[in-house]
Amino acid sequence: MKKYNKSIGFYGEDLSAKFLEKDGYSILEKNFNCSSGEIDIIAIKDEIISFIEVKSRFSDSFGKPKESVTCSKQGRIINAAKYYLHIKKLYNYYIRFDVIEINFHIDSSKYELSFLKDAFRV
């Protein structure tokens, strides 16, 4: 099941990246990892760097995808974002923390994508 969930996650991240590019974002990084945590997508548009968590689900039986971005997870994303900004020397940008949630339909190839800008703050 874990391998299946990972492949759904990667598929969701690919769909999200395509959505963002179509919306005018430039993708800076995908799956940025450091000791503090991981960020699914880092993108920029209009001088705003967005740190984006992607959550994909087939069912709401465990809650909405965005609900799994807990305070603890937010803290790890924030720390990873601080590290990213430091190592890339990106000091003069506005930043934002977003969530993209994707709900897949089990019986078809359709899905619903929601882009939640400014989903949480430092």
Swiss-Prot record:
Superkingdom assignment: Bacteria
GO MF: nucleic acid binding
Pfam families with a match to the protein in the record: UPF0102
Entry-linked Gene3D superfamilies: 3.40.1350.10
SUPFAM superfamilies per the UniProt record, alphabetical: Restriction endonuclease-like
Alphabetized InterPro entries for the sequence: Restrct_endonuc-II-like, tRNA_endonuc-like_dom_sf, UPF0102_YraN-like
Parts forming coiled coils: none
PANTHER family listed in its UniProt record: UPF0102 PROTEIN YRAN (PTHR34039:SF1)
Listed HAMAP family: UPF0102 (MF_00048)
Record family assignment: Belongs to the UPF0102 family.
Protein name: UPF0102 protein CPR_1677
Organism field: Clostridium perfringens (strain SM101 / Type A)
Classification lineage: Bacteria, Bacillati, Bacillota, Clostridia, Eubacteriales
